[in-house]
């Protein structure tokens, strides 16, 4: 499978992201939450008039789980599925009552789903493949729902930006599935931040700690990496742990900052036992913003019994915000605070709200696609951190945007 060709127009358009004002960034982030928090009753209307034909590409783990939810959703009808592995495609297809002739496999199974004339497509494959898949879906006139991160390198990320903007121009919906931006406690806390409850920000700290995924020995092909999230251990397939996992926390930090960083420095290493693939799993990154705000991001992914925890702390001159993925979000201050609350089921609830929002956008013609630019910015920020650590020096945002190098995979021997 070839990567999408480079488009020189993307560089100018992406550079605009670095010069957007704080107000524009916050407005985009705020609108990203509005669409996802509407009543399902408003979203669905008449089932006969709003049922959308859908295809799901990537059916292992989260992809299969999302496919089951979409199949039960009153607004969608799954008419095609695809997975690299034919047995996975057929097993899920049988469970969802998809005809055998519409259960596709191989690297190009996504194209068969698109060619089956679905209205919408859900992309849940390793992110290396997202730019090509999303571009093909948008060119075919499909609405696109995709996982994060949006890509594994800068050219791929900018390709997603262009595909998303093309969707908007074509009056189609393009949604990236970040769960925290749908959480009512995060939304309310961020509204209070905009109103000034924290005062001037001094420090942001984001973090993500969890165990690593299975890291199988290398084989004759990379097929063994396409199962059980093993691809997260491969930088080209999954972007590396900082891009694939830490992005949840980094995205919240950017949401709070209302801007993108101007530079990053950092360190990273591989500490998981018997590492077979190249992704680093321990990171300590420092980001700087143009207004002097400092942000640190730290994470580790080793099987050492550490319980999952991810979130962000924001320290201002008047108060401190604590925002946890699946935990409590609150603000403590010298004058004012916010009791907030917990969202222990955010992983599932966030997905459900995003699927509802995707359907609502399709049937109501809401195609401003507010999740696009925040998701692109979050991906670029994690790429900035990854590259600063790998290069062992300071890397600026502008340096990053000039990076035309694509991460390449040897797809020899894989089923097309």
Task: Annotate each language-model stretch with its function.
Residues 5-33:
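N-terminal secretory signal peptides and thylakoid transit peptides that target proteins
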Residues 28-37, 65, 244, 248-261, ...:
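C-terminal helical cap and adjacent loop that interface with cofactors, partners, or active-site loops
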Residues 58, 169-175, 180-277, 285-287, ...:
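Predominantly a Rossmann-like dinucleotide-binding segment in NAD(P)-dependent oxidoreductases
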Residues 76-95:
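NAD(P)-binding Rossmann-fold cofactor-contacting core
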Residues 101-119, 123:
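A structured beta-alpha segment of the ubiquitous adenosine-cofactor-binding alpha/beta core
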């Amino acid at each position: 499978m070839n990567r999408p060709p480079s488009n020189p127009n993307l560089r100018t358009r992406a550079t605009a992201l670095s010069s957007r004002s704080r107000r524009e960034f916050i407005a985009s982030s705020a609108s990203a939450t509005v669409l996802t928090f509407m009543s399902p009753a408003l979203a669905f209307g008449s089932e006969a008039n709003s049922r959308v034909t859908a295809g799901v590409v990537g059916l292992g783990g989260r992809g299969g789980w999302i496919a089951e939810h979409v199949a039960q959703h009153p607004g969608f009808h799954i008419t095609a599925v695809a997975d690299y592995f034919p047995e996975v495609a057929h097993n899920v297809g049988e469970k969802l009552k998809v005809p055998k002739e519409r259960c596709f496999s191989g690297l190009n199974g996504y194209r068969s789903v698109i060619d089956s004339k679905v209205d919408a497509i859900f992309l849940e494959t390793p992110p290396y493949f997202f730019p090509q898949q999303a571009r093909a879906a948008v060119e075919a006139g499909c609405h696109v729902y995709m996982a994060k991160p949006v890509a594994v390198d800068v050219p791929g990320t900018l390709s997603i930006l262009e595909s998303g903007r093309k969707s908007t121009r074509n009056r189609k919906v393009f949604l990236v599935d970040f769960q925290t931006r749908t959480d009512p406690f995060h939304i309310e806390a961020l509204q209070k931040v905009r109103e000034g409850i924290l005062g001037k920000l001094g420090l942001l700290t984001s973090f993500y700690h969890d165990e690593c995924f299975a890291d199988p020995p290398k084989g004759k092909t990379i097929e063994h990496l396409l199962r059980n999230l093993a691809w997260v251990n491969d930088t080209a397939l999954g972007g590396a742990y900082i891009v694939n996992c830490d992005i949840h926390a980094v995205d919240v930090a950017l949401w709070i900052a209302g801007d993108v960083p101007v530079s990053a420095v950092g360190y990273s290493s591989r500490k998981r036992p018997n590492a077979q693939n190249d992704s680093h799993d321990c990171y300590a990154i420092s980001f700087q913003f143009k207004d002097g705000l400092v942000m640190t991001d730290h994470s580790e992914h080793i099987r050492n019994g550490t319980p999952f925890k991810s979130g962000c702390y924001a320290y201002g001159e008047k108060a401190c915000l604590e925002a946890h993925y699946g935990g409590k979000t609150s603000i403590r201050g010298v004058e004012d605070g916010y009791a907030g609350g917990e969202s222990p089921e955010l992983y599932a609830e966030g997905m459900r709200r995003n699927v509802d929002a995707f359907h609502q956008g399709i049937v109501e013609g809401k195609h401003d696609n507010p999740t696009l630019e925040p998701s692109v910015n979050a991906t670029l920020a994690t790429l900035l951190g990854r590259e600063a650590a790998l290069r062992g020096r300071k890397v600026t945002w502008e340096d990053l945007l000039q990076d035309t190098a694509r991460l390449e995979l040897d797809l020899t021997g894989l089923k097309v």
